[in-house]
Amino acid sequence: MKRNLFIALFFFAASVPLQAQQSPFIRLTETSLMHESRATPSPLDKEVVNDRFVSFQWPLPLEARPEGAPMDGFEHLVKKVDKSKLAYKIRYAQDADFKKGLVQADTRWPFFNPEKPLTPGIWYWQYGYVDNGQTTWSKVLQVTVGDSKQKFCPPSLKALLAKVPKTHPRVWVEKENWHSFIGQSMNKPERQWYLERADKVLATPMKSVKDINTSQVKNLTNQMQINSYLTRESRRIIDAEESNTEAVIRAYILTKEKKYADAAVKRVFTMMDWDKDKNVKGDFNASALLSLCSMAYDTFYDQLSDAQRKQLLNAIKEKGTDMYKHFNNYLENHIAENHIWQMTLRILTMAAFSVYGELPEADIWTDYCYNVWLARFPGLNKDGGWHNGDSYFTVNTRTLIEVPYFYSRLTGFDYFSDPWYENNVMYTIFQQPPFSKSGGNGSSHQNVARPNSIRIGYLDALAKLTGNTYAADFVRRTLVKEPDYMKKALLNKPGDLAWFRLQCNKPLPEGPGLTALPWGYVFPETGLASFQTNWDRVGSNAMWSFRSSPYGSTSHALANQNAFNTFYGGKPIFYSSGHHIEFTDAHSMLCHRATRGHNTILINGMGQRIGVEGYGWIPRYYAGEKIGYVLGDASNAYGKVTSPLWLKRGEQSEVAYTPENGWDDVPLKTFRRHIVHLGNTGYIFIYDELESSEPADYTFMLHTVAEPMTVDQNNGKYVHVQGLSGRGGASDAYIFSSGALQTDTTSRFFVPAHNWLRADDKGNFKKYPNHWHFMAKSEKSKVYRFATIINTHALKHPAKAPEILSDGRIKAGGWLISVNVKTEGNAQFFIRSTKESVSISYKAGQETVVNENGYETRMSDVLPELEI
C-alpha cells in the first residue's frame, strides 16, 4: 500500500538562542519554552511569515501582566490592573529608519492587525508602551513576508462590519434568508430533533435558581471545594435551562410559531438575573445568560416591545461589559485561557454582533472579538494539535466552527482556509481513530472511550468546509454503524453543531479515505505523536501514542513528558492512570496530573514540575512506509514546582509540592526517550538515555486501567510485564536495563480517588475504580539505560518472547536489534528488518539515520516553531 513519507522539516524561530548550533544534538537550558503570559513579540525578530497575514503582537508591560485567577471563582485574588490606562503604539515600514512608507497606529491592546496584508519583502516594526504621553519603543524588529499564493489573508474589521445587516435576526439566521432557510431545513433530521426537544420543554415545568443543591457544602473542607461544588451544582440548573430555552428559540426560527416565541421570551426574562444569586458561581453561568439574552434580542426583535428590548440591551451591556473587561489586555497574551477559548469568547462575539449598531459598547466588542480571533485563533500553534488533550479539545468545538462560519457567511471569505484547520484534522483523526480510546493526554482523558458525537460532528463540519476526504471517511465509518450518532450532541453547550448542519448545505466530499493516511503523525509544536498498524479494521489495530511537550503541564495538560500509551482494538493497555475529579483536587494533582500516573520515568522517586517549566520536546521524528521514529527529550522537566500560578493553586487546594508528594530538585542532566515503530508488526522499541550529575535511581513505570498486570522476572536478561485491555488485546513489555531492577506492583493510588464533587441527578456519588501500577527501580548510577521491546497484539495469539542471539543481538518480530544498555560506552542502537530493506541507527551525540527503500534520511535535533 502506497504511503506518504512525512519527515521533520520544521525550522526554529523562537527566543531560544541555539539555532546557530551546528551539533546534531541540542541541549536546552531554558527554564521554559512557553510562558503563561506572552514574553516574546510575534513575529519574532528575523522571522519569515509565508502562510498567513502578519499580525503584530507583543508582551503586556510588566506591571500589567496578571497571572489570571488561580481557579474559576477566585478572580477577587488577582492583582487589579487599570486597563483604561494601557495604551500602545506600533509602527512599521519597509525602511529600517522608518522614514519612507511609514505606517503608525495607536492601539488599546497589545496587538495590531494591519488593515491590508503586508506586501512580500522585508519589513521593520516596533511596538511602544505609552505612559503619560511618553512612548517607550521596543528595539527594531524585522520580518520577511513571503509571497505564497495560498497565504491566509482574511478581510479587515472595516470590511466585515460593512456586511453586518441592519435588520434582525442576523446571527443564527439572516432576516432576508429566513424563509429559504426554513424551506431548506425541511428534509434535514436536525430540524425534527430541535422541534421534538422544544415540544418536550414546553410540556415540562421550568427549574428555578432556588433548586441549586447546596446540601454538601457543610461536608467540604476548603474554599476551593466549596466554590467548585457550587459552580457544578449551579451549572447543573443553568445549563439545563439554557439548553431548554435555546431549543425553544431555535424551534421558533425553524417555524415562526408564536408558541415558541412566547415561551422563549418568558424563560429568558425569568433567567436574566440568575447570575446575581449567591449560589451561582463561575463564568460559564454568566456567559450562558448573556447568550440567551442576545439570542432573544436578535431572534425576537420584531416581537419585543420597546421596554423589553431596552431591558435586554441593559442585561447584555452589563454582562458583556464584565466579559470584555476580563478579556482585554489578558486573553491576547495568555498561553491559553481555558474558558475563554472554549466558550465565552464565542458567546461575547455573537452577543456583540447581535446588538452592533444599537448598543455603543458593541463597537469595541466587535473590534476586539474579531481582531483577537485573527491574531490568536483558531489554534494555539501551527501544527494543529491541542495541548490540553482530547477530552478538553471537544469543549472548543462550537467556537472553532461557529465563529469562523459566521464570519464566512457575513463576508463570503473562507475562514476555514486557515492552514491550521487542515492540520487539526490530522490531530483529530490520529489522536483518536474510529471507535478507539483517546491518546491518553490531558485532564479527563479516561472519559473518552471512543470518538464522541461532538468529535464526529466536528469532523463532519471540517470535511464539508475544507473538502478533507479523510475526515469524511471517518464520519461515514461512524454513521454507518450508528446513523443518528450525532444526535447525542444535540444542545450540548460547547459541542452541538446541529445548527451548523442546518445552515450548511455542502455534502461530505468524496476521495481518499483513512487507508490512504500514513501510519504515524507527529505534532512537534504540541509535542504529540501517534502510530497505527491498521486503519481499516480497528479490531486489529495496534496503536501507540507519545507526548513530550513544550507546553509542560499547565492548564489541562499533564506532567507526562516522554510518556507513551499502547492500545489494541481501540482499547487501552499500558495507559495513563488516575482520575480527574477536579482541576486541583489532591488525587487529581498527585495521581492524575503528576508524573507517577504515567508511563514514563521518575528520578530519585521525583516527578516533573507542574507548569510550563516542566516541559519536554520532540527533537527528531520520522514516519515512513515501513518504519517510524520519535525522539522525546524531558531533560528539563524535573524539579521543584516554581510556577507562581501553580504554587498558589496548590496552596488554595491544600496540595503540597513536597518531596514526600513527589517534587524536589534532582541531578538529572539527560532523559531522552527514543521510540521506533517496527512496521506493522505491533512491535515498538523504546530506548531511554539517562544521565545525572551524581548517582541517582531511575524508576521505569507502566500502568493499566482495565486489568492487573502480570510480572515475570524468571529470565535473567529482562523483566516481562504483560498488560491486558480486557477486550482481547495485550501488550507484552520486555524491559532490558543496565542492572538489576527492584520491582513493585500495586492496585492502590498514592492518594485515594474520593468523589466529593460529581453527583448524579439523584445525588449519588459514583466510586472511581482503582488502577494498576508497575514500577522498576534501578540502583543508583550517574548513567543508566533501559531498552524495552513491546509487542501489542491479540491475546488469542500469544506473544513470542524476544530471542537473544549468541552475539548479543535481540531478534523480535522480524527485526534484529543491537543496543547498548550498559552504563559504559556510548548510548546507541541499530535495528534492521530481516524481511525488507529498512534500518535505523543512532549513536549518542550524532544523527539518527534511517534507510528505507534505498533512501537515507539523516536527522539532527530541530526545535519547533514556538511563540508566547
Predicted regions located by residue number:
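Pro/Thr/Ser/Gly-rich low-complexity, intrinsically disordered linker/stalk tracts
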Residues: 22-76
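Low-complexity, Pro/Ser/Thr- and charge-rich linker/hinge segments at domain boundaries
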Residues: 24, 143-173, 711-712
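Recognizes extended acidic, P/S/T-rich segments that occur
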Residues: 72-75, 79-120
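Extracellular fibronectin type III
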Residues: 132-147
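CBM-like, beta-strand-rich accessory domains located in the C-terminal region of large
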Residues: 170, 580-868
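Aromatic-lined, polymer-binding surfaces characteristic
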Residues: 194-195, 219, 226-437, 444
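Carbohydrate-active enzyme catalytic cores, enriched for enzymes
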Residues: 355, 395-573, 779-785, 802-868
